[in-house]
């Protein structure tokens, strides 16, 4: 069974894990109603995507 020859230091362990953090989702602004929305998705408040109504306003 493989066993490490030397102890991994706290600094080396933390440097290895430096890129493992989670990034928050990027929010853009809806050009129609100025509400925050996720990119490449229809606006949840007004139902438009790329200037076209894709979800009817009665459904929202």
UniProtKB/Swiss-Prot annotation:
Which Pfam families does the record cross-reference, listed alphabetically? Ribosomal_L32p
Compositionally biased intervals (Basic residues) = 1-16
Any one Gene Ontology MF annotation carried by this entry is: structural constituent of ribosome
Q: Does the keyword Cytoplasm apply?
A: no
The cross-references to SUPFAM superfamilies, in alphabetical order and at most eight, read:
Zn-binding ribosomal proteins
Superkingdom of origin: Bacteria
Keywords recorded for this protein, A-Z: Ribonucleoprotein, Ribosomal protein
Q: Name one GO cellular component term.
A: large ribosomal subunit
Q: Return the annotated region ranges for Disordered.
A: 1-20
Q: Which GO terms describe its biological process?
A: translation
Under PANTHER family, the record lists: 50S RIBOSOMAL PROTEIN L32, LARGE RIBOSOMAL SUBUNIT PROTEIN BL32
Tell me its family.
Belongs to the bacterial ribosomal protein bL32 family.
Q: Spell out the protein name for this chain.
A: Large ribosomal subunit protein bL32
């Amino acid at each position: 069974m493989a066993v490490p020859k030397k102890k991994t230091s706290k600094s080396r362990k933390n440097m290895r894990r430096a890129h493992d953090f989670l990034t928050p989702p990027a929010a853009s602004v809806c050009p129609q109603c100025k509400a925050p929305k996720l990119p490449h998705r229809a606006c949840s408040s007004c139902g438009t995507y790329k200037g076209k109504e894709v979800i009817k306003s009665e459904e929202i």
